[in-house]
């Protein structure tokens, strides 16, 4: 039976265990994703406590990490989502995303509403991809694709 979490602590504690086992076994997020049939971003988010994994994927990942059936069952439970504590993020990488939304959030809202109408972009019916590409001017660039279904506001 599908279970649901009503506190973040159990999944966050499991995420700590997963990160420790991942490091001890020298595995990458891609190594853990391989064979699940799911995307790298989804599995990584699930292992960090933000999504439930299907049973077969949870069992496969736990086997790779040397974790027990209790861990697999917890990975299959619906988490209480949201990994950033209240306030402004302090991690530099996470803060840059916060900063991007501070700068471009109103622009994104204006363009979404102009092109789609009154509504939102779903974070549930959603795909995330990140790619590293070479910058012609030197160095690397991160290409991040946020692909969410548009959901119109419905008057009632």
UniProtKB/Swiss-Prot annotation:
SUPFAM superfamilies: Cyanase C-terminal domain, lambda repressor-like DNA-binding domains
Catalytic activity, EC: 4.2.1.104
CDD domains documented for this protein: Cyanase_C
Alphabetical keyword list: Lyase
Gene Ontology biological process: cyanate metabolic process
Reaction equation(s) it catalyzes: cyanate + hydrogencarbonate + 3 H(+) = NH4(+) + 2 CO2
InterPro entries in the cross-refs: Cyanase, Cyanate_lyase_C, Cyanate_lyase_C_sf, CYNS_N, Lambda_DNA-bd_dom_sf
Entry GO MF terms: cyanate hydratase activity; DNA binding
Active-site residues from the entry: 96, 99, 122
The protein's role, per its UniProt record: Catalyzes the reaction of cyanate with bicarbonate to produce ammonia and carbon dioxide.
Family listed: Belongs to the cyanase family.
Record protein name field: Cyanate hydratase
Source species: Pseudomonas fluorescens (strain ATCC BAA-477 / NRRL B-23932 / Pf-5)
């Amino acid at each position: 039976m599908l279970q649901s979490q009503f506190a973040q602590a159990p999944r966050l504690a499991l995420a700590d265990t997963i990160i420790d086992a991942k490091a001890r076994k020298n595995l990458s997020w891609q190594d853990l994703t391989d064979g699940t049939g799911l995307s790298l971003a989804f599995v990584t988010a699930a292992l960090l406590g933000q999504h439930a994994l299907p049973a077969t994927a949870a069992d496969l990942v736990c086997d790779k990490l040397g974790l027990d059936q209790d861990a697999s069952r917890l990975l299959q439970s619906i988490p209480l989502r949201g990994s950033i504590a209240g306030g402004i993020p302090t991690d530099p990488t996470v803060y840059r995303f916060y900063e991007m939304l501070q700068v471009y959030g109103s622009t994104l809202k204006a363009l979404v509403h102009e092109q789609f109408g009154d509504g939102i972009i779903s974070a549930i019916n959603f795909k995330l991809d990140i790619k590293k590409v070479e910058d012609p001017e030197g160095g690397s660039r991160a290409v991040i694709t946020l692909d969410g279904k548009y959901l119109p506001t419905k008057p009632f």
